[in-house]
Each structure stands twice: as structure tokens, then as C-alpha cells.
Amino acid sequence: GGRPQGPNGYRSWQGASVGGALCISVRDTAKFVSEMQTIQEAAPYQAKLLDQEKLSALTEPKKRLKIAFSLGSPIDQIPLSESAKNAVKKAVQFLKKQGHEVVEIDFPINARQLILRYYEMNAAETAAMLEPWEKAHQRALNSDDIELLSYALLEAGKKAPVTSYIQALDEWDQTAAIFDEKIWRDYDLFLTPTTAKTAPKIGEPLISDALKKELYALKNYDFKKQMQLIAAAFERSLEFSPYNFISNLTGQPALSLPVYVDDATHLPMGTQLWGKKNSELTMLELALEFENHHQLILPDYYQN
């Protein structure tokens, strides 16, 4: 809603994909939000413009906030690491010290079905994205032309039923309604880990060789089997990052704060602030409170 789109398309992945920025300060994040926000007549998703004066002269929250947090996994059979939990606990301890009301709750949904719907959208959108290339070159793309998962999504997208795609979009909206009912009616913000565990090693295999063979042959299967294989292919990566797609699909703003470092690997672990639509200013104000009290952990060269 708040980011410029077009001119080749205004509903990128039905609103589930939008550009962002990796920033090293809350000031820079607020500046990015301020300068990038816009209203476009052609854009189907609209968000009201935030107050630029408040963004440029950001202050800590002027009132005590009521913040929910959860140490539960959003997806069954995907556990959270102790580092992920410790990052949230550290943030919770700080928030309580600052006088905010912090309440532990269960994660409001089991997002297993939602991620399957997300893959269905990925498949249909990938097919739509690559179809012009196939028409221009008068041939179908094959597994030698593009990366394997993209090829798998392309083949599944060609068989995706229209009804399945519509049902997927409906489920996104129903999930947003659940968040409203279980969180936003009672709390200002929601706090979770950013990821379930620290990042994988560069080059760490996330798809088995046996599964890769199945993906190469994906065009030979029906849509149901195709989606089962695609879900299996994404499962290892989902074990690292089971949160972020949820806010993407529901349209809720989210902000990751680098507050913790894993003792064993010395890799960063973030906590993620979630807010209801148009709550970016509140999120940035709270992020500033973390920053002003030296809770954000940054590399030394950013601090000198």
C-alpha cells in the first residue's frame, strides 16, 4: 500500500511482495519510510500517508504500550531454537523495565495451511511472470533455463486451478481477521522472534538430491502432487524462517530489531515487531526506545 508500484504491474504477487530496506539506524528506517511512501491512483492497495514531520523528528513512545509476545512456533513441527526464545525474552525484559505492559500469548494461528496457500500463489504468479518469455521465444522454459525451484513453481503454476488461487487469497484475508480478533483489539504491538534459528551456512544444502530428481520431473505429476513436492522442497528453509510470510500475506507492517547474538555461533538473532495496518509510527517509536537505550547490537564499524 505505501510503496510505489508499477508501471508494469501494481499488485505484485497480490500485494504479498514489496520492496524494503536494510537500515543500520531507526533514523534511516524512518527516513526510508517517509521518502518512499506514496499514493498511486492505479495501485489497488492503498495506505494512508504517515506524518512526515513525526517521522523526521521521531521520539520515543509518549504512552505506555500494551505489547503481546509469543514464544510459540507459528507452524506445527517447526521448533524454535533457544536463541530465538532468548532474543524475545531479552526484549521483553527491557520493555518491562521501561514500563510497558507485556503479556505472553499463544501464537494466534497454526500457519501450516497458510504456507501451503502461499506456495500455490507463488506457483501461479511464477507461471504468469514467465509466460511472456515463453510466448516471445515460442517455446516452453525447461529445467536447464532457470533455477530448479523456479522451474518447479512454473510447472505447478501451469496446472493451478483458478478456484484454488481464489481460495488462497480468501485465506490470507481470513488470517488477517484472526489477528485482529486475537491481537489488535487488545494490544498495540506483537513481538516474536524474527527467525526460528540462526542463519544456515553459505552453501548448506536445503533440498535433498532425491527430491531434486522429483522436481526435475514435476511436469509429469498432477497439481496436488506437484504442490506436495514443492512444499517438501521449501521445508528446510521454512525451518529457519516461519514468520515473515505471515505478515506479508496479511498486510501487517513488521520490523526486525537486532537485539541478540547466539552464544555458540556468534550469529545475530532478531526480534520482530508486528503491528496492525498503519501502525508504522508506533513501531518506529518503540524501535527508537530500543536504540536509545543501547539494545540494538550492530557491527563495530557501524558504531564508530
Q: What is the predicted role of each segment?
A:
Residues 1-89, 294-303:
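A short helix-breaking turn/cap at a secondary-structure junction
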Residues 21, 267-276, 283-284:
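Short, well-ordered beta-strand elements
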Residues 44-50, 64, 70-73, 105-120, ...:
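Flexible, acidic loop-helix segments that line cofactor/substrate-binding pockets
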